[in-house]
Amino acid sequence: SDAKSATIYSSWHKNSSTFIDGLIGYGYMENDLTRIVQANPSNPLTGNRGVKQYFTSIKFNKIRDKDNFTSLLFGRFDYGLSKLKSFSESGNAHALRFEEQDLKNKSISFGALTKYKKKIKKGYFLPYGRIEFFENLTPDSEAKTSYVSDPNTTYNYTVKEDYSNSLKLELGFDLNLIDSWYFATSIRRLIKNNKDFENEFAIKVSKPF
């Protein structure tokens, strides 16, 4: 594949605690595709498809420090549009033609994080908690295809997201020691509205040298 892209980024802050970041971009990609059909595996199907991509993202952060507590409120909006060009395969009698297709990706998320900073004998102990809600606003997309040998019969396939929103919960702590050792651990649970979920436990240890 061959890809080119350009992005413009800007950051604005009203004061030292409120930040808004945004970017907008465009990309173009050429993909060389190969498909093998079980009925004729010795003659693979090949094709080339171009994709134009438009995308933007806006992020908001508000930080508040009070005593040993740091609170962060955040939100984000993402939008992307991929315009897939039509193309035809070649190679054998099972070759397909794919029509133009638009793939839209749209989502919004917001949440909060609270961290407590406690000085200990050899450094700092920083426990934290985080909650984030994610709403997937991506619409369905329809793919249309036909056999090159039979262009009058069209087959449709609807591309759907498997869930529309999720809730992420995270607890953890960082341990920064004066002798440069750094420890971090966290446990995270992602709950999706389709009754699916993911659990993650992470440990990180580092020391510069």
PLM feature segments, named:
Residues 1-209:
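Membrane translocator/pore-forming domains, dominated by Gram-negative outer-membrane beta-barrels
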